[in-house]
Curated annotation (Swiss-Prot):
Stated name of the protein: Apoptin
GO cellular component terms, semicolon-separated: host cell nucleus
Keywords: Apoptosis, Early protein, Host nucleus, Host-virus interaction, Inhibition of host mitotic exit by virus, Modulation of host cell cycle by virus
UniProt organism field: Chicken anemia virus (isolate USA CIA-1) (CAV)
GO biological process, one term: symbiont-mediated activation of host apoptosis
Localization of this protein: Host nucleus
Matching InterPro entries: CAV_VP3
Biased composition (Basic and acidic residues): 88-102
UniProt region (Disordered), positions on chain: 1-28, 57-121
Record's note on what induces expression: VP1 and VP2 are detected 12 hours post infection, while VP3 only after 24 hours.
The protein's role, per its UniProt record: May act as transcriptional regulator. Induces apoptosis in infected cells. Element of infectious replication cycle.
Length: 121
């Protein structure tokens, strides 16, 4: 049996309630989602939700909805891990080893020059 009566008019499914706090909504338990539709950007702040990673942000027109979008669209995800940076060693012995290698390369003597004389006959 259906829980709703048939003569009940349909009501709104969602109600907008503005935030009651002035503190920023972006907390470890809040995520902000931006959805772009035909030049309009909709920003949603979702608090208390789990993380879900999207493979990438792409654009597709309504005419060609199966398209994956443009390759030149910038990736706007902010939660991406940064690529690992080159770490420099602070160990002085490693610095000395590389310094010695450089000095060996630059100071390796080439063949000694010999004087060439031209003899005219």
């Amino acid at each position: 049996m259906n829980a709703l009566q048939e003569d009940t008019p349909p009501g709104p499914s969602t109600v907008f309630r503005p935030p009651t706090s002035s503190r920023p909504l972006e907390t470890p338990h809040c995520r902000e989602i931006r959805i772009g539709i035909a030049g309009i950007t909709i920003t949603l702040s979702l608090c208390g939700c789990a993380n879900a990673r999207a493979p990438t942000l792409r654009s597709a027109t309504a005419d060609n909805s199966e398209s994956t979008g443009f390759k030149n669209v910038p990736d706007l995800r902010t939660d991406q891990p940064k690529p690992p940076s080159k770490k420099r060693s602070c160990d002085p012995s490693e610095y000395r080893v590389s310094e010695l290698k450089e000095s060996l390369i630059t100071t390796t003597p080439s063949r000694p020059r010999t004087a060439r004389r031209c003899i005219r006959l």
